[in-house]
Amino acid sequence: MISTPYYLIDKSALLRNLQVIDQVRERSGAKVLLALKCFATWSVFDLMQQYMDGTTSSSLYEVKLGHQKFGGETHAYSVAFADHEIDEVVAHCDKIIFNSISQFQRFSSHAGNKPKGLRLNPGVSCASFDLADPARPFSRLGESDPARILSIIDQLDGVMIHNNCENRDFERFDALLTEVEQRYGEILHRLSWVSLGGGISFTTPGYSIDAFCERLRRFAQTYDVQVYLEPGEATVRDTTTLEVSVVDIGFNGKNLAVVDSSTEAHMLDLLIYRETAPIKNAQGDHAYQICGKTCLAGDIFGEARFEQPLQIGDRISIGDAGGYTMVKKNWFNGVHMPAIAIKEADGSVRAVREFSFDDYVSSLS
């Protein structure tokens, strides 16, 4: 048995999402790229490659990882490329997308004949949290002025639009896309490809897949463009758990269970977005606050109920631990970093990466 803590990726659950993605590809004509900023655990890329067209990135290292480990199309994007990295980025990508016109003007000559794009910020989004809203005031994410974009349109092959965030509502997606068309239609007609980014929760049960595919197909036909999608969370939703063990039990107005993991170090977005972790099979008469083991007072996974009183050594599965977890894990407090394990279709589990004190030491100097 693998020692806790560890991330457990269920390949059967991952396959369910990938089959939805493949259905969207086939029915809409869109190409689908994995957003490495969300999930970059390359030990399952052999499965994902069969259902996706490539990767999209936010940095030089992600570009290289996508090119070397995933294959297919490799799209390079960054909020700001640096002089010392641009040539290496170009060497590992198939398309390069610039965040601003100034970046485009500075570096487009380095890209040679490779397709070039620009991030288009339509100024509207569905983000409910200001921290993640690309349309927030004074946003640095992309260009909004149609006239400025048209000034370089003859040098552009495509644009990337990323203004959805955990959007589970097709009608909201449709409305946002319509706003983009109304303001930027002249630009769209002069491109060969358009990426609609990520944040579209089309693998969520009950999502209007039929309407979604038809909308993508119609958009592609209207503007004669290849549509790209860049799912991250939608790819790995409900595929991964963080397996932890209870290491202490206490009471301070409520029952407290301290586990051998941490939100700050292992599921950081719970803190950033003030969310509560879903606890698997958490129902019963015995309520506990599930606490992380760092010194941070607010290192709390959430509340859960259990059929029996918890004991030291009991294992707990914390759900939805695939997106923005392994790519953000850190060594805060020197807490043991979770291993990464894979559950195969036959139910067998194998560890693919384990971390040690040597990894902690080598991450510092």
From Swiss-Prot:
The modification N6-(pyridoxal phosphate)lysine is found at K37. It comes from the Bacteria. Its EC number is 4.1.1.96. GO terms for biological process: lysine biosynthetic process via diaminopimelate; nor-spermidine biosynthetic process; spermidine biosynthetic process. It catalyses: carboxynorspermidine + H(+) = norspermidine + CO2; carboxyspermidine + H(+) = spermidine + CO2. Disulfide bonds: none annotated. One of its GO terms (molecular function) is diaminopimelate decarboxylase activity. Induction: By arsenic. Substrate binds at E233, D269. Pfam families: Orn_DAP_Arg_deC (PF00278). Its cofactor is pyridoxal 5'-phosphate. SUPFAM superfamilies: Alanine racemase C-terminal domain-like, PLP-binding barrel. It is found in: Cytoplasm. The keyword Chloroplast does not apply. InterPro entries: Ala_racemase/Decarboxylase_C (IPR009006), De-COase2_C (IPR022643), Nsp_de-COase (IPR005730), PLP-binding_barrel (IPR029066). One of its GO terms (cellular component) is cytoplasm. PROSITE patterns: ODR_DC_2_2 (PS00879). This is Carboxynorspermidine/carboxyspermidine decarboxylase. It comes from Herminiimonas arsenicoxydans. The lineage of its organism: Bacteria, Pseudomonadati, Pseudomonadota, Betaproteobacteria, Burkholderiales. The gene is nspC.
